[in-house]
């Protein structure tokens, strides 16, 4: 009986020690439409973030690239779902259906949604996504009073307890906490 107790104590000690070790930082993964997570990746090792926000049919600032660099430097392991396509071809058969369904699926599956409204943009799809996911508990919204519907965003976020930040850096700081 005493041997069993010693064995159990040693086993528990090893488990506790292994949990306390610093885990090696894995590269931040960025997944776009028409891409999948590599098969050899343990999805449980990563937290996922959907990058919702201004794209303006590709003419908007590529803020998603800056976000990827910030997450690469941040502690933790991250997979970013980025809906921006480098070569968007709306004439491709069923492309719009694919894109919308890809976005909705990844919005639902993500651990966090980082939503960025750029000043000077209209971002109608992002406003739609705000309405769809305001109650999800996953949203972190970046919006300044330079966005033409700032008050709508601010009021909606306040109603549902969604934090609003003035910068991507501030929002990411809260996500990685």
Located regions from the model:
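Bacterial N-terminal signal peptides that target proteins for export
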Residues: 1-7
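Bacterial N-terminal signal peptides
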Residues: 8-15
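Conserved catalytic or regulatory cores that recognize and/or transform ribose-phosphate-containing ligands
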Residues: 19-177
């Amino acid at each position: 009986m005493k041997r069993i107790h010693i064995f159990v104590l040693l086993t528990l000690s090893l488990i506790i020690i292994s949990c306390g070790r610093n885990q090696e930082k894995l590269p931040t993964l960025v997944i776009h439409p028409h891409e999948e997570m590599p098969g050899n990746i343990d999805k449980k090792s990563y937290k996922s973030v959907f990058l919702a926000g201004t794209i303006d049919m590709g003419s908007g600032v590529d803020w998603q690239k800056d976000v990827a660099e910030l997450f690469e430097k941040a502690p933790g392991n991250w997979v970013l779902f980025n809906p921006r396509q480098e070569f968007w071809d709306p004439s491709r058969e069923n492309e719009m259906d694919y894109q919308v369904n890809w976005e909705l699926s990844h919005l639902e599956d993500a651990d966090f949604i980082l939503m960025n409204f750029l000043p000077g943009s209209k971002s109608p799809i992002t406003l739609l996504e705000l309405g769809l996911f305001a109650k999800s508990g996953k949203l972190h919204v970046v919006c300044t009073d330079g966005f033409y519907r700032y008050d709508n965003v601010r009021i909606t976020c306040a109603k549902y307890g969604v934090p609003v930040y003035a910068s991507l850096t501030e929002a990411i700081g809260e996500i990685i906490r």
